[in-house]
């Protein structure tokens, strides 16, 4: 900018300020309040004139945009927008332009986008780094994340699952015996809140199997609540603001420090005593967490990655297991079918459950699969656009620094793909009991070969390079939990519950809203759990 032009601009600014300061305070306040609305209206008008932009959902409040409608009921919001604009549209979310592409073509466009076009790291780092900690997951380059996934691969192998099943089974039995919510060896019935029991049950089973006996011995029910505080750090507000002086932010930070410190104590003790063996994921990371370029993960980064691994294996499993209990409370007929399947496969209880026997229980897997269809753990998957992205077969171009959003969960509830989509029906999978789509061309992003295709209408674990690597663990964990639970008790809704509660979308993880209780009774009154 030339000196003369700069002087002209400064002169105009001074003139405007002079006239502004000459106004009364009420006039000044009116301008300050009205100006953003005028700017927003002009911006939306100019946006609508551009033929290379996807349709934008109009909004009244500047910056906030459609945040309230989206945050309260995202699937309902998507459905209304789809009816008006089609599968591709944009909306304003707290100062960010979000381009939504619904349906299977949207899955392919966003989840299989080139690394040069979109970034999950830039989209999620404000949300995830305060929860997991620095240097891991989305607080590092993508190639580092791919290697971190590979470090965890052995803990998520079929051989590992064979070891985990007895551990998970033992933990569930122990929980049913000793938890204040059940105390089954002393009580024959009771009423429990599933969002109190299931986070505890899943944290105990995940920690016992993934982190080993030493770490597990340091955990109690309060540890599950710390992870719940981390869960509450996953909200649309956290997506925009990394730090705010609010209670849920403070609780998130306290939980992160406490959990990280607990892991560090174990790591430091093992280092000090030269006690690194091959017992659990902690040992595995302490011995093998070295990147291809020779850089080793620090112990603090290992602790942070452990938070991420257990978080991935806990918060979604807790939500899913809660939904399973709630849906089965409404379907005692399916409870009985599950019990009959257990008795048939386990020879009336004469056989102990194994990983191989879990694979012989199709209905159990179908219940989990149907629950994941109806309640995708994450209702929205984001990427930040790092290079202008043309939308195939349209004139639209999504500009750099906008965001793209895919919603497999919306597809899961579409009548186009799943007839009677709002009905819980595990038998819709009778001819397709496998956990997820696994056929077709494979691709290796650095952590093992996975299915390349993401155009399926059923993607409970996402797709592409950021696909969740814990699908096998989730089915093993949830299958083992409900094998024990179904053999131990029957359950239904208490009198004040009118059916399966609606989802609560205030968190990024789809949880059941309160009240979410079940009334249970022991299946065999004198049986020792």
UniProtKB/Swiss-Prot annotation:
Gene3D superfamilies associated with the record: Cytochrome P450 (1.10.630.10)
Cited PROSITE patterns: CYTOCHROME_P450 (PS00086)
Binding-site positions, heme: 468
Compartments where found: Membrane
GO process annotations (BP): ergosterol biosynthetic process
Function: Sterol 14alpha-demethylase that plays a critical role in the third module of ergosterol biosynthesis pathway, being ergosterol the major sterol component in fungal membranes that participates in a variety of functions. The third module or late pathway involves the ergosterol synthesis itself through consecutive reactions that mainly occur in the endoplasmic reticulum (ER) membrane. In filamentous fungi, during the initial step of this module, lanosterol (lanosta-8,24-dien-3beta-ol) can be metabolized to eburicol.
Protein name: Lanosterol 14-alpha demethylase
Species for this entry: Eremothecium gossypii (strain ATCC 10895 / CBS 109.51 / FGSC 9923 / NRRL Y-1056) (Yeast)
Phylogenetic placement of the source organism: Eukaryota, Fungi, Dikarya, Ascomycota, Saccharomycotina
């Amino acid at each position: 900018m030339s000196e003369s032009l700069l002087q002209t601009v400064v002169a105009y600014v001074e003139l405007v300020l002079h006239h502004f300061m000459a106004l009364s305070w009420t006039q000044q306040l009116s301008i300050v309040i009205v100006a953003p609305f005028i700017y927003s209206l002009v911006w939306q008008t100019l946006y609508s004139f551009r033929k290379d932009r996807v349709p934008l959902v109009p909004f009244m409040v500047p910056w906030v945009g459609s945040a309230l409608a989206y945050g309260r009921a995202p699937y309902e919001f998507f459905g209304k927008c789809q009816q008006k604009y089609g599968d591709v549209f944009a909306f304003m979310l707290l100062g960010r332009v979000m381009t939504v592409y619904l349906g299977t073509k949207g899955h392919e466009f966003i989840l299989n986008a080139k690394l040069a076009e979109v970034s999950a790291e830039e989209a999620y780092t404000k949300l995830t780094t305060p929860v997991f900690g620095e240097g891991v997951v989305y607080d590092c380059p993508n190639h580092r994340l791919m290697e971190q996934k590979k470090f965890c691969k052995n803990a998520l192998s079929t051989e590992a699952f064979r070891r985990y099943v007895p551990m998970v089974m033992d933990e569930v039995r122990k929980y049913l015996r000793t938890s204040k919510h059940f105390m089954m060896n002393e009580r024959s019935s009771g009423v429990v809140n599933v969002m109190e029991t299931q986070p505890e049950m899943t944290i105990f089973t995940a920690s016992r199997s993934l982190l080993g006996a030493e770490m597990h011995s340091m955990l109690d029910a309060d540890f599950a609540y710390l992870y719940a505080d981390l869960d509450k750090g996953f909200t649309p507000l956290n997506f925009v603001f990394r730090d705010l002086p609010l209670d849920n932010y403070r609780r998130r930070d306290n939980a992160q420090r406490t959990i990280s410190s607990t892991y560090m104590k174990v790591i430091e003790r093992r280092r000090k005593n030269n006690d690194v063996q091959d017992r659990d994921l902690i040992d595995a990371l302490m011995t093998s967490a070295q990147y291809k370029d020779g850089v080793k993960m620090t112990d603090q980064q290992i602790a942070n990655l452990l938070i991420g691994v257990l978080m991935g294996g806990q918060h979604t499993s807790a939500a899913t297991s809660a939904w399973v209990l709630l849906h089965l409370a409404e379907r005692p007929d399916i409870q009985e079918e599950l019990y009959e399947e257990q008795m048939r496969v386990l020879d009336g209880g004469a056989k102990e459950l194994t990983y191989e026997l879990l694979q012989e229980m199709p209905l159990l897997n179908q219940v989990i699969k149907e629950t994941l269809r109806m309640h995708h753990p994450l209702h929205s998957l984001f990427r930040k656009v790092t290079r202008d992205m043309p939308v195939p077969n349209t004139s639209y171009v999504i500009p750099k620094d906008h965001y793209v959003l895919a919603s497999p969960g919306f597809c899961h509830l579409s009548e186009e793909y799943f007839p009677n989509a709002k009905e819980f029906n595990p038998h819709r999978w009778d001819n397709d009991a496998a956990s997820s789509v696994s056929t077709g061309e494979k691709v290796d992003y650095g952590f093992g070969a996975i299915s390349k295709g993401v155009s399926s209408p059923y993607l409970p674990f996402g797709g592409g390079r950021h696909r969740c690597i814990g699908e096998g663990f989730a089915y093993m964990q949830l299958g083992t939990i409900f094998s024990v639970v179904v053999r131990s008790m029957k359950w239904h809704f208490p009198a004040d519950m009118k059916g399966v509660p609606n989802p609560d979308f205030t968190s990024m993880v789809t949880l059941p809203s309160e009240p979410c209780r079940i009334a249970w009774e022991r299946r065999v009154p004198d049986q020792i759990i």
